[in-house]
Every structure is written in C-alpha cells, then in structure tokens.
Amino acid sequence: MYIYAGSITESTGSLKGSGKGITVFSFDGEHLQKLQEVEDVQPSILKVYGDRLYCTNEVKDFTGLNGSGGGVSAYAVNKTDGTIQKISQSISYGSRPSYVVKSDDGKHLFVTNHGSHTTVTCHYIKNNLGQFVLERQFDDSSVAMFAVQKDGSIGNLQDLQVIHGSGYWCHGGGQSTSHLHCVKTKGEYIYTCNRGKDTIEVFTYKNNRLQLIQECQCPYGYAPRHMEILGEYTFVLYENYPAVSLFQLKQGKLYALDISITMPKTYYDVYPLPHFDKPHADKEEINTCGMADKRRAMPSDIHVFKEYVYVSNRCFSSFGTVSLLKMEKEKLAYTASYALPGKDPRGFAVSKDGNYLFVALCDTGKIYVYALDPLTKEIVKEVDHIYCPGVSSLAVV
C-alpha cells in the first residue's frame, strides 16, 4: 500500500510552509516507511489515477510573475515501487488552485482556482460626488478544464468559467467574494463547492465547453468546502459551521435530503447551528463563523466508504477530531468523534479495503494510521505515525 502526501511549502494565513513537496510512503499493515521526497511548489492537494498523479500548486505566482496565478502538475507513478517523476506542468489560469480531479472518461482535468482571501488589487476611482474612493478588486475564482494527453500529461486549456458573487459573511470571514474550493465529477457533470458564495455550481461539459445548469443554494453562511459522491448521493461538508448535508442526484442536479452535525452534541449546546434567512449579513452583525471565532470547530475534509462518512474537524482552541456518521434510509446519523493529537487535520483517507484510516495533521507535521473495526468502521487504535512536515493532503492506493 502506498501513501502520497502533499504539503504546504510556503506560509499562508495560519499555515506554516514547512513542507518540501510530495512525499511517498509505504504501509505494510503495521509500519509507515518513507520512500521518496520530491520537491515541488505548494502541492497542497493531490489525486492519483492509476499510474498518474496530479497536484495543484497553490500559489499566486507560479510563473515567477507576481499575481499571474497558480499551477497544476502531473507525475508518472512507478507501479512497481510507488515512486513518482514529474512529466508536465501548466499554469492554472487563476489564483491559488485548491483542487484537481480527472474526468470519468480520463480525457479532461478540472482545476478549481480558489483565489486569495486577503490579496486584492486596489483602485481609486471617482464617485458621483467627485470624490476619490477605494475600490478593492478580488482575485477571480474559477474552474478550468484542461485536455489530458495520451501519456497523461496536461494538455491545453479548453475552457475557463469564472464565478462571481459573495456569501453571507460578505463583510469578512472569507465570503467577501466567490471561492471555489472543491471540484468533483460524475459522468458528464461537474460539481464545484463555492465556499465564498454558499453555493454548489453544477456544470455539464460537451464539445470541450462547460455549461452551468444549476446553482444549488446551501445554508446561508455555511461555506461548502468539500464533497464526495457515492452513487446517486452527494455528501457536502461545510467549513464555517460543523455540519454535513446529504443531497440526491437526479439528472445531474442536486436535491437536499438531510443535514447532520459533525461534532458531539455537547458542542452545539454552546455553539448551536445558526439559521440565516437572507443571503448576506448586515454590516454590523457579529460574525459567528469559524473563520472569525477560533473557539469554534471548522470542518476540513470528508471521505465516504460505503455507507460510512468520515469528517475531519479543525479546532484551534483545543484539539482536532475525526467524526464518523452513517447513512441510513437517506438520513445521516452522527455516531462518534475521536480526538486527534493535533489541532489542524487536513486531508485524510480510508484504505480501499476499509481497514485503515490515514489522517494528515498539518500543525504537527505528522501522518497517523488508525485501525478500523471491520463491522462498525469505528476507530479501534493507532497503528503508527510518521513525520511529514506541512502535510496537507493524502492519497492512498
């Protein structure tokens, strides 16, 4: 079994750039062993498809020109020993690319460009009163579609869709503008979680063009961050408040079925889930989301194994957790949460056989392996851990 770990190599926000690139590990059921470390620029998210690995380069100046955008890279995977070698790279045609995924037919690569929370272009313009006032222009947030060459390398850009708008906490808290965070595919449909706008955009792609067919409204202020698709169901994890929604897919479009907690019930006695009945907060409204109040939990990633749903929660004032939910009759049932030896769990994954859970703790720079109960899929014990500075995402094959 091989584990591929992306990392944060350049400090940004609360994240320290202690990583060097992509690290390859092996796991024999008992021990993790480091096999290879390949230097790359901010390969924060990675995905493995057979003998090819793709990663985002989550920066604003991938070409060396400040503000020119991030990048996306492709690697060949040696199936014999698990090692990797870069075969191509491209600009991502946007700032801070946050996710990469390959189409089901293997012919296209989709990349979401998140955009920066803080870096803006400032212009002073004259208003109707003849006064010069500051106008702040944020980075575009977009989804880019690339061709995939026969050898798996990244081909030409085929389409780029820029999404505008803002979310409930539009006066701060990371929702002043659109921020596409995650992209997933199912057949001819493309789904993007827009944590800056509280929406999920649904596209089809035909003749190398993307077409928007639905803008699914999520709970105002909740900031959809990650999603997983399992058959006819989609699980959407929110970043601003610890909750996960279950949607049903019908002809590619999303229809809400249920919403569930991702933390112990005692947490919500102190921090109940809010309900906002308008798309934008008042300017003087106190921001209660996790981006503004660090005492609150901030969900980070989601992984689905059969009917079991795993969620990681960042808790900067105490300790991070992994929570287990179960889907039953189109409902989500919270089962348990497990404390982690760190505050900032990022990527994680369940092994294909469902026996192990791998968790990346970004703040401590360690990867942990936990054994799962074969029947309940609850965490049984820690099996091993290993040092991996700045680790931010995992792929287990």
What does each of the following model-derived ranges do?
Residues 1, 50-51, 105-107, 187-188, ...:
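Short coil/turn segments that connect the beta-strands within blades of beta-propeller domains
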Residues 5-8, 15-16, 55-59, 65-66, ...:
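Conserved beta-strand positions in repeat-built beta-propeller and related beta-rich domains
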Residues 25-30, 75-82, 145-155, 203-209, ...:
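Short loop/turn segments immediately following beta-strands, especially the blade-tip
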Residues 83-181:
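Asp-box/WD-like beta-propeller blade repeats and closely related beta-sheet repeat scaffolds
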Residues 89-91, 157-175, 257-294, 386-397:
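Surface-exposed loop and turn segments in beta-propeller and other repeat-based domains
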Residues 294-329, 337-359:
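Loop/turn-rich, solvent-exposed surfaces of beta-rich toroidal or solenoidal domains
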